[in-house]
Amino acid sequence: MNPIHPDHLIGRGAQADVYLYDNQVIKLFHEGVSEESVLYEADIQQRIYNAGLSTPQVYGVATMEGRYAILMEHVPGPSLGELMEKDRPRAPEYLKQAAALQVQMHKIPGHGLPSQQDKLRSRIALVSVLSEDAKQNLLLLLDSLAADQVVCHGDFHPYNIIRTEKGLAIIDWVDASCGSALADACRSYLLYLLHGKEAAEAYLHFYCEQANVSKEDVLKWLPVIAGARLIEDGRGDDVELLLRLAGASPLHPTKGE
């Protein structure tokens, strides 16, 4: 039977569809996604697996129906995001679990992964809604912030954390880098903030408590992280908030401003 069948579809994303077949996950990328980027993602995820973190093992890269696919281990279980949706009263408990997992991840050296600072620099440079002065200010701030050399996920939120029989597993490592734990935590804070302040503040509290760091040290990264996020949301509903967090004014003010 063809593994790429609607009956086997378990998820859709911006870049790929995800299928489950014969107890194996097939991440089938959309047409136009390059072989280089698929091989890169597979390599990053396998490096993370080899480092001892709980994440699906990569079996290989294949071509299916003219598209590239990553074949990987199936990690069964609901995401923490799904659990939070179904049981709102337990949301703080799940946030605390996620924070503890991120703190644990940040104890692992990130050598061999792409540079977080380089990623942030390139993203800020490409943001079309920021003026050159605003970009320069963010880059100067980035240079002034201390950088660790630890594993950073880059997109650490509840839907990328799976609760399995053996514990929590982390998926979707395409944005992984070697860099600052505080910056990675700040990115998570921002992702929560874009959906509501209450969860964002709760997560920040749990992370800082378990990492033994101050909220102020995490939030020092917020202008840089928000500025870099504009490469993803530069035309979306969140652009005004992101510009404000980045300490910048719109490059092209709307009428009446």
Predicted regions and their residues:
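Helix-rich C-terminal or lid/interface subdomains of diverse kinases
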Residues: 187-257
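Active-site acidic catalytic loop and adjacent metal/ATP-binding pocket
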Residues: 18-20, 139-183
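Short beta-strand micro-motifs within the conserved protein kinase catalytic domain, predominantly
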Residues: 57-68
